[in-house]
C-alpha cells in the first residue's frame, strides 16, 4: 500500500494547511440544507482537496459516492450514479450521502458528453450534499459556477509539509535527517502528495534517510503553460524561457495563442504592437513547419515569440489573471451551439415525425414565431432546456428564467398529484367510469408519440 493512501487524513483536524478552507467546508456541512449551494474545492494538485472531502464525510458520518475522470461521465452515467445518490437516502446507516465529483474541470470531450449540463441538473434536484473537485476553477462552465460556491486550496508551505513527513518516518521506523525532509518539502512545490511519494521512493527499504538519498526521487518539475506565460512577461532569462518551452506539454502554435490572448498585460500600446509583431514572425515559422513537415523550425518559432514578447514586456509582469486564448472560448461556444441545434432538430423530428431537413428548411421559422409568443407552453410541449429555448428567443437570461419557472410549476403539480393520490377516496363514481357516448362521429387523433406543432 502506498504511503499517500496509508497516511491520508481521516479527520479534518489532520489536514495539513489551508485551515481557512477547512473551516469553511466544515461550517457548510454542519449547517447543510437543500438551500445551500454545492462546494467546488479548487487549487493545485496535492493541496488536500480530495482528502478534505473524505475527512469531512468521515467526521459527519456521511457515505461517499464518488465519480472521477476514469469513469464514463456521460449525461446518462452521471444521472444514473450521482443523480440517484443525490436524491435517495443511505442504506448503510450513514446520516447522509456526500456526492463527490473529482476532476470536475476535466468535463470535456466525447466521453463526458453532456456531463456539465447533467451536473447542473443534478444540483438543482439534489437532496444530498455535493462537493466538486477541480484544479482550474476558471476552466469551469459559467452555468456550473453560478450554482456552486468556490473554496480555494492554496499550495502548502514547506514548513507545513515537514512535520507530516516526520510523522510518517516515525510511523514507518525510518530515521530521517532534518536536511532530507527539508529538501523533500522544498522540492515538492507545495504538493503534499508529491512530497509523500518522494519520501516513499527515497526511504523504501532503508532504516535511515540521508539528504543524499533524496535526489533520486525528485518530483517531476515540468513547467505549465501558466508558468511559461508568467515567466515571459516577467522577463526571465532567455535560457530559462527556452527550457520551459520544451517542458510544457503545449506545442509552439498553442503557446503562440496563449501569448496572444494575454498581450493585454503589456504596459502600453507600443509594447503590445511590438509583441504582436514578434508573434506574427513566429507564426510564419509555424506555418512553414506544417507546410514542409520540417519540425526543426519550431525551435525558431519558440525563440522568436518568447524572447520577443519578453523583451517587449520589459519585465512588467502579469497584473491580473492569465487567461486561455479567447479564440478557444469562441470555438467552444460555436461548437456547443451547433450541438444544441442538432439535438433540438433530432428531438423535434422524433416528436413530430417530420424529417430534420424539412423541419429546418420549412418549419423552423414558423416554430420560432410560435415559441417567441408563448415560450412556456412550448417548453412543456417539447421539453426544451434553456439552451434549446435560447435558439428560438435569442435571450439567454429570459430562456433560463422561463425554464426554471416551468420546472417549478411542474414540480408543484407533481406534489399536488401525489398528495391527491394519498388522500382517501369516498367511493364516488367518476364520470370517467362511464363509457363514452357514441355520437357517430369519427375522430382523427395524432398517432401515438406524435406531437402537433399548430
Swiss-Prot record:
<keyword id="KW-0235">DNA replication</keyword>
<feature type="binding site">
    <location>
        <begin position="43"/>
        <end position="50"/>
    </location>
    <ligand>
        <name>ATP</name>
    </ligand>
</feature>
<dbReference type="InterPro" id="IPR027417">
    <property type="entry name" value="P-loop_NTPase"/>
</dbReference>
<dbReference type="GO" id="GO:0016887">
    <property type="term" value="F:ATP hydrolysis activity"/>
</dbReference>
<comment type="function">
    <text>Part of the RFC clamp loader complex which loads the PCNA sliding clamp onto DNA.</text>
</comment>
<dbReference type="GO" id="GO:0003689">
    <property type="term" value="F:DNA clamp loader activity"/>
</dbReference>
<protein>
    <recommendedName>
        <fullName>Replication factor C large subunit</fullName>
    </recommendedName>
</protein>
<comment type="similarity">
    <text>Belongs to the activator 1 small subunits family. RfcL subfamily.</text>
</comment>
<keyword id="KW-0067">ATP-binding</keyword>
<dbReference type="InterPro" id="IPR003959">
    <property type="entry name" value="ATPase_AAA_core"/>
</dbReference>
<dbReference type="GO" id="GO:0005524">
    <property type="term" value="F:ATP binding"/>
</dbReference>
<dbReference type="Pfam" id="PF00004">
    <property type="entry name" value="AAA"/>
</dbReference>
<comment type="subunit">
    <text>Heteromultimer composed of small subunits (RfcS) and large subunits (RfcL).</text>
</comment>
<feature type="region of interest" description="Disordered">
    <location>
        <begin position="408"/>
        <end position="454"/>
    </location>
</feature>
<dbReference type="GO" id="GO:0006260">
    <property type="term" value="P:DNA replication"/>
</dbReference>
<feature type="compositionally biased region" description="Basic and acidic residues">
    <location>
        <begin position="408"/>
        <end position="446"/>
    </location>
</feature>
<dbReference type="Pfam" id="PF21960">
    <property type="entry name" value="RCF1-5-like_lid"/>
</dbReference>
<dbReference type="InterPro" id="IPR003593">
    <property type="entry name" value="AAA+_ATPase"/>
</dbReference>
<dbReference type="InterPro" id="IPR023935">
    <property type="entry name" value="Rep_factor-C_lsu"/>
</dbReference>
<dbReference type="InterPro" id="IPR047854">
    <property type="entry name" value="RFC_lid"/>
</dbReference>
<keyword id="KW-0547">Nucleotide-binding</keyword>
Amino acid at each position: 500500500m502506498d504511503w499517500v493512501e496509508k497516511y491520508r487524513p481521516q479527520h479534518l483536524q489532520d489536514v495539513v494547511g489551508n485551515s481557512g478552507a477547512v473551516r469553511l467546508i466544515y461550517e457548510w456541512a454542519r449547517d447543510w440544507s437543500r438551500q445551500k449551494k454545492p462546494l467546488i474545492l479548487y487549487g493545485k494538485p496535492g493541496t488536500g482537496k480530495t482528502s478534505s472531502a473524505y475527512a469531512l464525510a468521515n467526521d459527519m458520518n456521511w457515505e461517499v459516492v464518488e465519480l472521477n475522470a476514469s469513469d464514463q461521465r456521460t449525461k446518462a452515467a452521471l444521472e444514473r450514479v450521482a443523480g440517484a445518490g443525490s436524491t435517495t437516502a443511505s442504506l448503510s446507516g450513514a446520516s447522509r450521502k456526500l456526492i463527490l465529483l473529482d476532476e470536475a474541470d476535466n468535463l470535456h470531450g466525447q466521453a463526458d458528453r453532456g456531463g456539465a449540463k447533467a451536473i447542473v441538473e443534478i444540483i438543482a434536484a439534489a437532496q444530498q450534499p455535493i462537493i466538486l473537485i477541480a484544479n482550474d476553477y476558471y476552466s469551469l462552465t459559467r452555468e456550473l459556477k453560478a450554482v456552486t460556491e468556490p473554496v480555494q486550496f492554496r499550495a502548502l508551505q514547506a514548513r507545513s509539509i515537514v512535520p507530516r513527513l516526520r510523522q510518517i518516518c516515525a510511523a514507518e521506523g525510518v530515521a530521517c535527517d532534518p536536511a532530507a525532509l527539508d529538501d523533500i518539502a522544498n522540492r515538492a512545490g507545495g504538493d503534499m502528495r508529491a512530497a509523500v511519494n518522494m519520501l516513499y521512493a527515497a526511504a523504501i527499504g532503508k532504516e535511515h534517510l540521508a539528504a543524499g538519498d533524496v535526489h533520486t526521487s525528485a518530483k517531476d518539475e515540468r513547467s505549465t503553460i501558466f508558468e511559461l506565460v508568467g515567466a515571459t512577461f516577467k522577463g526571465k532569462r532567455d535560457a530559462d524561457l527556452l527550457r520551459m518551452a520544451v517542458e510544457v506539454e503545449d506545442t509552439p502554435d498553442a503557446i503562440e495563442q496563449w501569448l496572444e490572448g494575454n498581450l493585454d498585460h503589456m504596459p502600453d500600446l507600443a509594447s503590445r504592437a511590438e509583441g504582436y509583431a514578434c508573434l506574427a514572425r513566429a507564426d510564419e515559422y509555424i506555418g512553414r513547419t506544417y507546410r514542409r513537415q520540417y519540425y526543426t523550425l519550431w525551435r525558431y518559432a519558440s525563440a522568436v515569440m518568447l524572447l520577443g514578447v519578453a523583451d517587449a514586456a520589459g519585465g512588467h509582469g502579469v497584473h491580473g489573471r492569465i487567461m486561455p486564448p479567447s479564440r478557444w472560448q469562441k470555438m467552444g461556444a460555436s461548437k456547443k451551439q451547433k450541438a444544441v441545434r442538432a439535438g433540438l432538430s433530432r428531438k423535434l423530428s422524433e416528436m413530430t415525425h417530420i424529417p430534420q431537413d424539412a423541419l429546418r428548411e420549412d418549419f423552423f421559422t414558423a416554430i420560432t414565431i410560435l415559441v417567441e409568443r408563448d415560450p412556456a407552453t412550448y417548453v412543456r410541449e417539447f421539453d426544451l432546456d434553456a439552451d434549446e429555448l435560447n435558439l428560438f428567443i435569442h435571450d439567454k437570461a429570459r430562456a433560463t428564467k422561463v425554464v426554471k419557472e416551468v420546472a417549478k410549476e411542474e414540480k408543484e403539480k407533481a406534489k399536488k398529484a401525489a398528495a391527491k393520490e394519498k388522500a382517501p377516496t369516498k367511493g364516488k363514481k367518476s364520470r370517467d367510469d362511464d363509457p363514452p357516448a357514441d355520437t357517430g362521429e369519427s375522430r382523427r387523433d395524432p398517432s401515438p408519440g406524435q406531437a402537433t406543432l399548430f
